[in-house]
Structures are given as structure tokens and as C-alpha cells.
Amino acid sequence: MMNPLIIKLGGVLLDSEEALERLFSALVNYRESHQRPLVIVHGGGCVVDELMKGLNLPVKKKNGLRVTPADQIDIITGALAGTANKTLLAWAKKHQIAAVGLFLGDGDSVKVTQLDEELGHVGLAQPGSPKLINSLLENGYLPVVSSIGVTDEGQLMNVNADQAATALAATLGADLILLSDVSGILDGKGQRIAEMTAAKAEQLIEQGIITDGMIVKVNAALDAARTLGRPVDIASWRHAEQLPALFNGMPMGTRILA
């Protein structure tokens, strides 16, 4: 079996039927012309935000990570492992793709520990066992994995989806693409940066050009590139016509170098 490709979905993608239609059409085209197994990892911050707003619950973030108190983890689990995950499975079904919905704890695929007590139920993802997902891939299924994990003590954890995708890529020896709302990392003039090193990223963070959630995304991509020993791409889902080429290894956004 070829090494898998993990496609991490993020941003407002899950909120846009047009975007999901484009994405799944691209996935169908890719699967028809390539034998390479695919895995989807997703968060769903927009789904969570809508739910929290409807319940009049405050959304707090610290260093770009969502603070998840004990009384909110059940709600966030329902939004990510429930609504967001099953929405993607429904789109896969619509496009005749045999998909299986998972969370990080299934088959111990990704190990999770608590990241920081101040963040509450927020987990740190580390590589786990490839057995379950490899078995699904060998049988032609598309695993769709939410970024909810569980600790060895049985505590549910909300994991940053970029970090979750990185840990799963390390588990499977997979390549990784981080799809987001933006076409890559932008410089101070709003121009896309084609390649990014750790030194360049540190410089842009110090200058305040890379901020908030993008810091988390860039650090996750740098961590992934180092862990995997190969480049990681950050790109946009907005250009559907480019997605099959992107999935095939053509750089379309910002390529993060190890």
C-alpha cells in the first residue's frame, strides 16, 4: 500500500455547501485516477461557535487554542465528533465514497494527554497505533477522523485539529496537507509565501505578521515537517480545480520545510 495522504479540513469549509461540493468532487476525481489512500482529519470550530452562541456560552481562547471547561467538553464533543463528522460522512455518501467516521481514540490511533490545566479539556496529540486505520485503508475505506481524543484515564479532550492531523500523519507515515480558508501563509503585504522555514516563521511571528490561530497552524506544520522528515503544505480549499494537483504533490499554497 502506498503511504497515505492526510487532508486536514478547517476554517469555514464545514459551513459552506459550495465548498464541500467542490472538495468532495475533487476527492472523487483523485480517487478515480490514483491508488493512494486518503484520510480526512477535521476540526469544526465554526460548528462549535454556532452551538455555543445558541446556548449563550462564552468562547474563550488562549494563544489561539480554545479553552474547554469541564462543563463544555460534552457539547464540543457532540459538535465535532457528532455534527461535523457526520456532515462529512453524509457528503461522502452523496458522492458514493465509502467512508468511516472515527475519533482519535478509536483503535488508540492517536494518544492524547492533557495539554495545560488552564485550558481545561484540551489535549496534546501524540502518535498511536496505525492498525485500525491501515485496516480500513487496505479495504478501500476513507477514514474521516474528528479532533476529539481521550486520555488513558478516560477523559475526553478537544485537540487542535492541525496537531491531531500531525500526530496521525506520524502514526501512519503519511504525507500531510492542511487545508484552510487562506491560500497559504501571507507576508506583510498580503502576498502568499511559497516556502517557509522555522527561522522565517519565527521572524514573521516576532514581527506580528503571523498571529493568533495562524501561529498554531504554522507551528503544527513545522512540527509535522520535522516529525515526518518531509514538507507539509498549507493551502486553500477554495480553488477546487487545483485540489487534485495539490493532492498529487504539486505545491499550491505554502510549503513548510523540515
Curated annotation (Swiss-Prot):
Protein name: Acetylglutamate kinase
Chain ranges passing through the membrane: none
Organism taxonomic ancestry: Bacteria, Pseudomonadati, Pseudomonadota, Gammaproteobacteria, Enterobacterales
Keywords (A to Z) from UniProt: Amino-acid biosynthesis, Arginine biosynthesis, ATP-binding, Cytoplasm, Kinase, Nucleotide-binding, Transferase
Family that this chain belongs to: Belongs to the acetylglutamate kinase family. ArgB subfamily.
Organism from which the protein derives: Escherichia coli (strain K12)
Domain of life: Bacteria
Keyword ATP-binding (UniProt): yes
Main function: Catalyzes the ATP-dependent phosphorylation of N-acetyl-L-glutamate.
Binding-site residues, ATP: 181-186, 209-211
Summary of subunit composition and partner proteins: Homodimer.
Main localization category: cytoplasm
